[in-house]
Amino acid sequence: MMVESESIRSTPTSQNGVGSLPNQSDSCVGREGSGSGETNGELNPAELLHFQQQQALQMARQLLLQQATCLNSPSTDNKQPSVQVPVSVAMMSPQMITPQQMQQILSPAQLQAVLQQQQALMLQQLQEYYKKQQEQLHLQLLSQQQAGKQQPKELALGNKQLAFQQQLLQMQQLQQQHLINLQRQNLVGLQSGQGPVPMQSLPQVSPSDLHQLLKEMSSSQEESSKQDTVDLMTSITTSFPTTKVSPPTMHPSLSNGQNTRRESTSHYESSHLLYGHGECRWPGCEALCEDMGQFIKHLNTEHALDDRSTAQCRVQMQVVQQLEIQLAKESERLQAMMTHLHMRPSEPKPFSQPLNLVSSASNNKMSHDTFPDGLPQPPTSATAPITPLRQGTSVISSSSLPSVGPVRRRIVDKFCTPISSELAQNHEFYKNAEVRPPFTYASLIRQAILETPDRQLTLNEIYNWFTRMFAYFRRNTATWKNAVRHNLSLHKCFVRVENVKGAVWTVDELEYQKRRPPKMTGSPTLVKNMISGLGYSALNASYQAALAESSFPLLNSPPLHNSSGSVLHGGHDDVTSTGEPGNSNGSSPRLSPQYSQSIHVKEEPAEDDVRPASISAPTNQTTVLPEDRDLESESPMEDLP
């Protein structure tokens, strides 16, 4: 308002004492004008008339002071206009001063300048107003096009709203033109302090009519804004559950029936997730719809935005959440299964049948004849059985193997589950999973030959059996074939026979059973101390007392050596020898008479290239190595762990 105090002229105001008076008076007028603009809607007609008279008197005094200032201050600028009119006079409204008063106060040139200023200001305001209206309409159209979720009813409502806004703009334009004409006739002026949106009225309109007109205009604007807000909230509330149900897919149709405008009906039909194969896929609704138009009509009528559709949407959200939880659980279960299958368990399977080391020679001989393949032998005496052999042998292996990591499966595991039963139980696993089988090449070759009806295979047939039974050999480099040929030529249990088919390989079971790992011999006291020191705490008292005695008549016979070796070694066929070849003296694997008071105790081998840790023994302890035919020196790089 302080800007209105300055007069519109090109030359600066003189700096004498008289020139400061109009500024003060103008500032007072501006403050009073602003006050009047603020309180105009609250004054009664009598107070308003009195206020207008005071404004006219102040205007007259201001005009006189302005003229006096112009006369007293000499002009030095050639561009000084001949007519000077203060802005406050140009901004005076008809309620403040009547045309008669203006004619009495102002000269004709000043009146013309006031009219020109009013017209220029009004044109500027009209341009700004129309520009803002166009921007608002453009934003509304863009928002509707981007949303693309208007139904025909809502589109018709939007068209009506646009038509109403256009009519309102036309009425405002006509009103502005009428006001300009009236201003040219020197009847009305522009209201001071008016905003960019002019709402003018005729001077003859009473204050009550003006108030009613303003109320109607504000109510219409509120209704339009409320409608826009309702549309926006509807789009938000309907799009939220759809996005919650299926986040990665943008639904072309929302739960309240709103659909996007597509370029082609076929593309819209193919991408609509609630319509397929001629029926509605809304949960719980299987209504038949012949075409897309009928489906859209059904969707808008039966599945509109109501309580039932909202409840169904919430139920669908809960269903999806439950499925996500179930999927997470199943994924964790699958991960645990994969981890278990790819990592061998730390503890082997428990042994089911207890064994006896003390038995008669005849029973041992019969058992050895009955179980030629080294299978577990049942107990043959009524003596108390020992604890499962797995525990004691595991202790021996752990004492002789300080290293950790992927190691050869222990003989006790093979003793509990022979290779035939192992392959039968885990046939599908080895066939599909790329896991290295825990058996030596010799045992696998023997198993391949025994599975054939005629007990003979060619070299290519052995290769095919390896690749057919194990995914590991099928998917890795075929360097393992060298190890197969090496084992076939090394071990005397594999016999090469020439027949009609060519060269075939067979297996000699008796020769195969003679294959034994390095054995340790010692006195019975050593055996007792070693077994008790290595964890045989669960041995019963009768067995410990039997070991403490000096004479073992039942342990001296050769069949018992085989039986005890079968028990301690598990009768298994594939243990790699780690003894040094230089120590072999070509003696028979049976013990000489001077070692008749000793028994055989198996030393668990470590990796193929690592010698086992020796166990301390008395001076009479002697290690006897079998002959060369018992050695199973496979290729170090190709030996199975």
Swiss-Prot record:
Main location: nucleus
A cellular-component GO term for this protein: nucleus
Biased composition (Basic and acidic residues): 600-611
Ranges annotated as biased composition (Polar residues): 8-27, 239-259, 576-599
Highest taxon listed in the record's lineage: Eukaryota
Protein name: Forkhead box protein P4
Region of interest (Disordered), ranges: 1-43, 239-264, 563-641
UniProt region (Leucine-zipper), positions on chain: 320-341
Single GO biological process annotation from the record: regulation of transcription by RNA polymerase II
Swiss-Prot/TrEMBL domain comment: The leucine-zipper is required for dimerization and transcriptional repression.
Keywords tagged on the record: DNA-binding, Metal-binding, Nucleus, Repressor, Transcription, Transcription regulation, Zinc, Zinc-finger
GO molecular function, one term: DNA-binding transcription repressor activity, RNA polymerase II-specific
Subunit structure: Dimerization is required for DNA-binding.
Positions with biased composition (Acidic residues): 629-641
UniProt note on tissues of expression: First expressed in the anterior neural field of stage 15 embryos. At stage 18, localized in three domains of the brain (rostral forebrain, midbrain and hindbrain) and in the eye anlage. Cerebral and retinal expression persists at later stages with additional expression in the branchial arches, at the base of the hatching gland, and in the pancreas.
InterPro entries: FH_FOXP4, Fork_head_dom, FOXP, FOXP-CC, TF_fork_head_CS_2, WH-like_DNA-bd_sf, WH_DNA-bd_sf
Short name of one Pfam family: FOXP-CC
Ranges annotated as DNA-binding: 436-526
Gene: foxp4
PROSITE patterns in the cross-refs: FORK_HEAD_2, FORK_HEAD_3, ZINC_FINGER_C2H2_1
Region (ctbp1-binding): 354-358
Localization per Swiss-Prot or TrEMBL: Nucleus
UniProt function note: Transcriptional repressor.
ZnF start-end (C2H2-type): 278-303
